[in-house]
Amino acid sequence: MVAPTLTARLYSLLFRRTSTFALTIVVGALFFERAFDQGADAIYEHINEGKLWKHIKHKYENKE
């Protein structure tokens, strides 16, 4: 008997039934959105280092 390949196991676990297929797509979209958003924020902050308020607010805060 031949061992099932990775793609065959993925198909049988995640994509065979419509309900698990839809759930897989939704969960994948949520993780992708989170990763993309954090990556875009990191790139934006790197490009604008020293120009954003959170980087320069210590210069303008009153110290009492």
From Swiss-Prot:
One of its GO terms (biological process) is mitochondrial electron transport, ubiquinol to cytochrome c. It is a single-pass membrane protein. Pfam families: UCR_UQCRX_QCR9. The chain crosses the membrane at residues 22-47. It is found in: Mitochondrion inner membrane. SUPFAM superfamilies: Subunit X (non-heme 7 kDa protein) of cytochrome bc1 complex (Ubiquinol-cytochrome c reductase). Residues 48-64 are mitochondrial intermembrane. GO terms for cellular component: mitochondrial inner membrane; respiratory chain complex III. InterPro entries: QCR9, QCR9_sf. The keyword Signal does not apply. Keywords: Electron transport, Membrane, Mitochondrion, Mitochondrion inner membrane, Respiratory chain, Transmembrane, Transmembrane helix, Transport. Residues 2-21 are mitochondrial matrix. Belongs to the UQCR10/QCR9 family. Component of the ubiquinol-cytochrome c oxidoreductase, a multisubunit transmembrane complex that is part of the mitochondrial electron transport chain which drives oxidative phosphorylation. Component of the ubiquinol-cytochrome c oxidoreductase (cytochrome b-c1 complex, complex III, CIII), a multisubunit enzyme composed of 11 subunits. The complex is composed of 3 respiratory subunits cytochrome b, cytochrome c1 and Rieske protein UQCRFS1, 2 core protein subunits UQCRC1/QCR1 and UQCRC2/QCR2, and 6 low-molecular weight protein subunits UQCRH/QCR6, UQCRB/QCR7, UQCRQ/QCR8, UQCR10/QCR9, UQCR11/QCR10 and subunit 9, the cleavage product of Rieske protein UQCRFS1. This is Cytochrome b-c1 complex subunit 9. It comes from Bos taurus (Bovine).
